Amino acid sequence: RQMCIRDRMPLTEALRNIHFPTNPDSLRRAQYRLKFEELFYVQLNILRYAKDRQRRYRGYIFERVGDVFNTFYSQNLPFQLTGAQKRVLKEIRNDVGSGRQMNRLLQGDVGSGKTLVALMSMLLALDNGFQACMMAPTEILANQHYETIKELLFGMDIRVELLTGSIKGKKREAILTGLLTGDVKILIGTHAVIEDTVNFSSLGLVVIDEQHRFGVAQRARLWTKNIQPPHVLVMTCLLYTSDAADD
């Protein structure tokens, strides 16, 4: 705020000084004024788009924390959650219970707890009668997520399936049928999950890992799997972060 006040210059004066500066300081202030205005309107348009999108897309309401989440928390949780993980989970619960479609970014280093937070978010969907899907950019990463989540859910009666391009024939048909009937509760896969033949009974939450490796159209196709778009949780790994939520 202090920078804005100190370097504030009327638009007409800024336009004049950008072409005919009276001194180096006037040129700097004019450049700052014009750059600030450009960035301000970019941010304003982003905010306007976000508000408009919230009005147009209502989200499913996850009203309850039920037996699935509580059983996992009390019996299967491999370690105590960190303060950051608890805070992020609370924010996610607020989002999915607000009536607006969640579109949240979850960032953290490798091993910081992102996958565990994503799984517990998916369990919230299951508790409220919905399915969940996780999409990863490669078969190797999808397999890693599948094995990790299967291990974390060991002993719980939750059908988790893996769908990649290499899964074909009867096994693939069984997975697709299970998605339609609702027997498959959690689907983990690659780009294969956005194919036209993949349809859900009630998809409530989509988790996307490393979203920068998917195109906008590819990510958006998951939203069309329901009449009403599901909640979206995007996981990304940054080199430096203080906001952590386990790969």
Language-model-derived ranges and their functions:
Residues R1-D7, Y240-D247:
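Conserved small/polar residues in nucleotide/adenosyl-binding loops
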Residues G169-I186:
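Conserved motor-coupling elements within RecA-like helicase/translocase cores
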Residues L205, R213-S242:
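Post-DEXD/H (motif II) to motif III coupling segment of the RecA-like Helicase ATP-binding lobe
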